[in-house]
C-alpha cells in the first residue's frame, strides 16, 4: 500500500530513531568493555597457600589455624571442620594483612557438605565477608566476631527463600534512608541460591559514605554512614581509641561459622587512587 507523504515522513523519522537505538547500545558496550579492561583488580588469594592472611579463631591465639580450619586445596580457599569433634561456638575469621577505605571486593563462593556437629541452626550454610573491621590484634581471645560490617553470605536450605549478601552488624550500625538501623541483620533483595553453585558476591565500599552489596552483578542492598555502636562495650573502647565512631576504613576478613564454604576467587579493586 502506498503511504501518504506525511506517513512516509513519520516512517522515515522512526526508522532513523530505531537505527539510533541500535547503534548507541553497541557504543556503550564498547565503552563499558574498555572501562572493565582498565580496572586493575588484584587477587588477594594466590591459589597456593594462605600467604597474606592470618587466622583469628575464638579461644585460640592470633595466627593459630586451629584444626586446619582454613586451608588451600586444588587452588581453592576452603573453610572446613573435619578436625572438630564439636563446633562449640568456635567462630573464626581469616584476616587479610592490609586495611582499606575505598575499594570493591569480589569473591566467588559456594557452600558444600554438612554443617559441623554442634553448629548453631542459624549458621547453616552461613558465612560472611567482614569489611571496615577492627584489626585482629584488638580482639580478645574469647571474642566471637570482630566489630565490623558483615556482608552475610547464605545458601538456600532447599525449601524456603533465603537471601544472600545481607547485612549484619556486630558492634556496628548503619544508616538507611536517613534512619539509623539498630537491627542486627537486614535482608537484601537477592534471589535464593540452593545447592552448591558458585555465586559472585561483590561489595563496594566508599569510606564512611556508602556501602553497596551486589550479587552476580546486581545491586541488592545499599546503606550509608557505617559506624561503631556505642551501646556495645567493646565497640565503645574502639571509639575511645579512634576518637570517632564513624568507620572510614578497616580490615577485611572471611568467616568460619560451622558450615563448610569454599572461595575460588578473592579480588580487590582499589578505588582510593
Each language-model region and where it sits:
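Compositionally biased, intrinsically disordered/low-complexity regions enriched for serine, proline
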Residues: 1-2, 22, 158, 167
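N-terminal secretory signal peptides that target proteins for export/translocation
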Residues: 1-10
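Carbohydrate-interacting regions of secretory-pathway proteins
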Residues: 28-273
Amino acid at each position: 500500500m502506498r503511504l501518504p507523504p506525511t506517513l512516509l515522513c513519520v516512517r522515515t523519522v522512526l526508522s532513523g530513531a530505531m537505527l539510533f537505538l541500535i547503534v548507541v547500545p553497541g557504543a556503550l558496550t564498547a565503552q563499558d568493555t574498555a572501562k572493565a579492561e582498565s580496572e586493575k583488580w588484584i587477587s588477594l588469594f594466590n591459589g597456593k597457600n594462605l600467604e597474606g592472611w592470618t587466622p583469628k579463631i575464638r579461644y585460640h591465639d592470633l595466627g593459630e589455624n586451629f584444626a586446619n580450619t582454613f586451608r588451600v586445596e586444588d587452588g581453592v580457599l576452603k573453610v572446613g571442620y573435619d578436625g572438630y569433634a564439636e563446633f562449640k561456638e568456635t567462630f573464626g575469621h581469616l584476616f587479610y594483612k592490609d586495611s582499606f577505605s575505598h575499594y570493591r571486593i569480589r569473591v566467588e563462593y559456594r557452600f558444600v557438605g554438612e554443617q559441623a556437629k554442634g553448629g548453631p541452626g542459624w549458621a547453616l550454610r552461613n558465612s560472611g565477608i567482614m569489611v571496615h573491621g577492627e584489626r585482629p590484634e584488638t580482639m580478645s581471645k574469647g571474642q566471637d566476631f570482630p566489630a565490623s560490617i558483615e556482608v552475610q553470605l547464605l545458601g538456600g536450605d532447599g525449601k524456603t527463600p533465603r537471601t544472600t549478601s545481607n547485612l549484619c552488624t556486630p558492634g556496628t550500625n548503619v544508616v538507611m534512608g536517613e534512619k539509623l538501623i539498630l537491627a542486627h541483620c537486614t535482608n537484601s533483595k537477592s534471589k535464593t541460591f540452593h545447592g552448591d553453585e558458585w555465586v559472585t558476591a561483590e561489595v563496594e565500599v566508599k569510606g564512611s559514605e556508602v556501602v553497596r552489596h551486589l550479587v552476580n552483578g546486581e545491586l541488592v542492598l545499599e546503606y550509608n554512614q557505617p559506624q561503631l555502636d556505642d551501646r556495645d562495650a567493646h565497640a565503645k573502647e574502639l571509639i575511645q581509641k579512634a576518637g570517632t565512631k564513624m568507620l572510614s576504613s578497616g580490615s577485611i576478613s572471611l568467616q568460619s561459622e560451622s558450615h563448610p564454604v569454599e572461595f575460588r576467587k578473592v579480588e580487590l579493586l582499589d578505588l582510593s587512587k
